Each structure stands twice: as structure tokens, then as C-alpha cells.
Amino acid sequence: MTVPEAQVDAFGQDHVPPVVGTFEDAATGKTIHFWTKPIAQLLEVSVATYAQERIATNPTLNNLKGIDVVLGGDHGQGKFRSVIKIILRDDAGLSVDTLVMKVGHIDCTKDTYEVLKSSVAGPLNDSLKEVIESGALQVIRDPNGSVFFRMKNDEQDDQQLTIISSLHIRVFVTGNLTYSAAILGNVNIAGGWCTWCGLSPREWSPTEHDKGQLWTLEAMAEVRTSIRVGITADTSANRQGCVDVPLQTCVPINSYSLPILH
């Protein structure tokens, strides 16, 4: 059961409020409601709260060296939900503990490409970009001895603050094949084209087939641009599964955990 945001807000402590929005679904004419949460701010607040609650009883938290942020999404019971799993890792790269936080929600009957594009995809992409550009969550002590967490920002230079440690952040994306295909622009899985390398079903079906050239976000964008400006004809063979532009533009494809197609 999900606690209503209004009730969570009422507690008033260490809560990151959602950013709400609406849009009119062109396919149904209905008003779709959605919300997202800024992931960078959520990391600062949630990890700090977790550390304060657990570090006294779990001494391994003192050895934290890195954080993995895994974004995922799924649809069910008339709603789309996007969550992040925060994996806390020690200096050996082993998982110390995990947190799961909801970062996006859409009231919709289907999580189509257009629905995602018109709602949570943009804000979550910008939010992930902020985390990636920062690259680390810093543990900081102020002159009064209080400890807090802050995303690394090279433009911030407060000499009164002491950086205790800097937790390197890696970002990944996961989800079922439908969700992964949608956010990569491979709408409706594009007739079975490989998400990894762009081979057609005829090419990847043989057991001992040759490996194709691995996709990059830049290569996908080039395919769409070439078709849009008329350099390349808009055919299935030329699209190679790239039906539309990717909705996630800051996480490289080799950081996706995709279902195995071949």
C-alpha cells in the first residue's frame, strides 16, 4: 500500500515533495496526472536519514565508498511507477545495504512512448543528468560539527566545510523489455530488432550469427536525424528499430540491464 503524499508531507521531516503535472492524452482526450521527484535531492535526504538511523547499529556504514543508482519503471493496475534502488557499497565494492524510493508516477491505462514523453521522462532524464554530472555524494562536516550529505558541485567552495568522504555514484537503468524499448525509442520493440546492436530478426535468429555493431545513444540519434532531414528513407531496414528519439539521453546503453533477446 502506498501512503498518500499528503500524509507523508504532514510528518514534515526529511521529505522531498513531488513535482506534479498534467497533460491531455491525444489518444484518449483525457487529462493525465503525474508526478516526479528530483533524484539528486532525494539522494541527499534519504541517504543522510538512513545513515543517521543505521550507522550506530551498523558499523560497516562507516566504510561506504560508493553508490549505485538504478532507475526502473513498470505499469500495473492503471498506474505507471518509476523507482530507484540505491545500493550502498563499501571499499571492496560489496553491497552494504539498499534503499528503494519511488521517483515517478502516472495515472494511465498504458505507459506508451507518448505518455512517458509527455510526463515523467523529461524530468527524470534531467534529474539523472544532474546526478551523473555531479558524480558523487559528499559527506560534509560544518563548523558546528554537524554532518550532512550534499551532491558534489565543483562551483561550491566553502572553506568552512570539511569534506569527510566522497561517495562515487554510478547510474544504471533497468525494466522489462517494453519499458526499456520505449525509453530508448524502440517503440513496440520495433518488430524484434535487437536493442543492443540493431540486428534484424532474420540476422540474429541463427544460433551462430555474427555480432552486430553495438548501439550508442549518439548512433541512435544519428539514425533519427538522418531520417528526419530526408537524407535516409524512412524504412524499417533504415530505422533498425530506432522508431523515435530516446527519452533517456544521459545514461549510455551499456549501463542498461536489458532482458536477453539473443
What are these regions (language model features)?
Residues 2, 22, 26-41, 63, ...:
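Intrinsic disorder
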Residues 5-83, 155:
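Structured nucleic-acid-interacting core domains from mobile-element enzymes and related host factors
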Residues 7, 39, 43-47, 51, ...:
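Generic structural signal of hydrophobic/aromatic residues within well-ordered alpha-helices
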Residues 63-118, 122, 199:
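Acidic, metal-ligating active-site segments
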Residues 71-72, 124, 169, 194:
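Generic structural hydrophobic/aromatic packing signal, biased to beta-strands
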Residues 116-136:
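Inter-domain linker/hinge segments that demarcate the starts of reverse transcriptase
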Residues 129-262:
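Charged (Asp/Glu and Lys/Arg) segments that form or flank catalytic channels of large polymer-
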